[in-house]
Amino acid sequence: NIIDVPCRPCYYRDSSGNCVYDQLGCGA
């Protein structure tokens, strides 16, 4: 199994598996 490494704080993983900055989820 491939372990999915969590994205950095304030980032989320999109449907393509990329870590994308999450403006809404980061202490707005």
Curated annotation (Swiss-Prot):
Subcellular location: Secreted; Nematocyst
Keywords per UniProt: Disulfide bond, Ion channel impairing toxin, Nematocyst, Potassium channel impairing toxin, Secreted, Toxin, Voltage-gated potassium channel impairing toxin
Molecular functions (GO terms): potassium channel regulator activity; toxin activity
CDD domains reported in the protein's UniProt record: Ugr_9a-1-like
One cellular component (GO) term of this entry: nematocyst
Taxonomic superkingdom: Eukaryota
Disulfide partners: C7-C19, C10-C26
Major localization class: secreted
Known function: Possible voltage-gated potassium channel (Kv) blocker. Increases amplitude and duration of crab leg nerve compound action potential.
Protein family per UniProt: Belongs to the sea anemone BBH family.
Protein name stated in the entry: Toxin Bcg III 23.41
